[in-house]
Regions:
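Loop-to-helix transition at the N-terminal end of transmembrane alpha-helices
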Residues: 44-48
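Membrane helical hairpin/interfacial module
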Residues: 58-73, 77
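A contiguous, mid-domain pocket- or channel-lining segment that forms the substrate-recognition surface
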Residues: 80
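Active-site loop segments of alpha/beta catalytic cores
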Residues: 1-31, 35-40, 50, 54, ...
Length: 236
């Protein structure tokens, strides 16, 4: 049973020879090649090499394009900071939507427009070429509250839930459209599964989660399923 067969069978509830092994690796994968993590985040060829080497060395059943949470925000125009040996970071005190009125004029970037999203899509195409017959290929997008926080600033967004609920709904609706466009191109490029990172959901209580976050996570997952993709939701 190949890794690909194992994961697909398990997802469909069929017997497998062992449970699939699909741990998230980012900086660990870069270490396997001796690459700077900055290069892992910005050069799809470095990411692909690190993922494949890690999967082969440790018996993983998949490869993954996750490197940091800033791909989509950077392409939207958000200021980000690059480091030699840690993930790309959003600069919260310069948040793109510090002025929330800018949301009305914010354009969704083209995932194939040569930016960081495009870099991730190129990684998927290379994964498909190199290991597509054997491994499951997982793309990555940000969830509604995670990307909303990347664009607005996490601390400001937490106050928006109380101070301006309609804005939060508008922001999350924008995020869902952005992420579904990105997911569509990732699936076309070769992704079998779309991972959704929505870590900021763990920072709110159940009332806020059910009113604001859950409905948009559901729309996002349903949208990816409608595109023919499988979904893995990651809330760390």
């Amino acid at each position: 049973m190949t890794s690909r067969e194992r994961v697909l069978a398990h997802l469909e509830g069929r017997p497998v020879d062992r449970l699939p092994l699909m741990p998230i690796t980012m900086m660990f994968a870069a270490v396997q090649t001796g690459a700077r993590y900055r290069d892992y985040c910005t050069d799809y060829r470095v990411l692909v090499e690190g993922q494949i080497r890690t999967a082969e060395a440790f018996g993983f059943d998949y490869v993954n394009t996750m490197s940091d949470p800033a791909r989509e925000a950077a392409d939207c125009g958000a200021p980000v900071e690059y480091f030699e040996s840690q993930p790309v970071a959003l600069i919260e005190d310069q948040a793109l939507l510090a002025d929330k009125t800018k949301l009305a004029s914010l354009k969704i970037p083209d995932p194939l427009g040569g930016g960081r999203m495009h870099n991730g899509i190129k990684a998927l195409a290379l994964f498909k070429e190199r290991v597509g017959k054997d491994k499951i290929i997982e793309g990555w997008i940000e969830g509604p509250i995670a990307e909303g926080a990347d664009l607005r600033g996490i601390n400001t967004l937490m106050m928006d839930f109380f101070d301006d609920p309609p804005f939060v709904h508008d922001l999350f609706a924008f995020v869902i459209e952005l992420e579904l466009r990105f997911a569509r191109e990732q699936l076309k490029a070769g992704a079998d599964v779309i991972g959704v990172g929505d870590a900021a959901a763990s920072l709110v209580g159940p009332d806020i989660y059910h009113e604001f976050v859950w409905p948009y996570e559901k729309k996002l997952v349903d949208g990816i399923h409608a595109l023919g993709g499988k979904v893995r939701l990651h809330i760390c």
